[in-house]
Amino acid sequence: MTIRTHNFFLPTLLIFQMLFIFAMSSFGHTSSDAQSNLFVDFIAQNFPHVRHGLENNLISLSTLIFLVRKTAHFTEYAILGSLFFLNLRNWLKSNSTLTENSKLQTTKTLTRKTPNTQLTKAVAKKSLLNPIKYPLIMSISLSFLYACTDEIHQIFVPGRSAQFRDILIDTLGASFGATITYLIIKLFAKIETRSDK
């Protein structure tokens, strides 16, 4: 897949996922319950152990619905975190030449204006202020911010409310998705490096 295709395809997937989360949060309490019940029925029909637990009161229906909803939250944001990471990484790669030129110019400027004893600290500080160097951290941070706006959105949806617990679950899901994506890419990069030797 070419860089130009990546520049269109990945952002489109990211926007679609953000809109999907927004749409799911726009459902009222009744619609949300109906969706959860569909998943619960599917699980009960296809997993005998779960059905046995419900029939023998080993697990309550409300607990199962709660687990289904929170798993959905986790999964939605795992996908979002992964897409944020891929988009940030792609942006970084496509702008690598510009970034290197900028760093070179910054170093030259600091060399002229900053004593040698302070040059290393100044360059290090400049690097820390460049968040795109850290797509993993930024993808988790952006997912957290989106989770916050999602909970604020739910305040205005009938029957829904904002819960800090959901923000934590969403952020945990985003962290999982972004980290797994990062590790997979790193693993394939190592395999490719070894095969070239």
Model-derived segments and spans:
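Interfacial helix-loop-helix junctions of multi-pass membrane proteins
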Residues: 148-171
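Membrane-interfacial segments
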Residues: 87-96, 153-157, 161, 184, ...
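Small-polar-interrupted transmembrane alpha-helices in polytopic inner-membrane proteins
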Residues: 16-21, 136-154
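Membrane-interfacial, low-structure loops and terminal tails that flank and connect transmembrane helices
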Residues: 92-133, 192-197
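Alpha-helical transmembrane segments of integral membrane proteins
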Residues: 5-13, 134-138, 142, 165, ...
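"…centered on the first transmembrane helix and the immediately adjacent amphipathic helix/loop
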Residues: 2-86
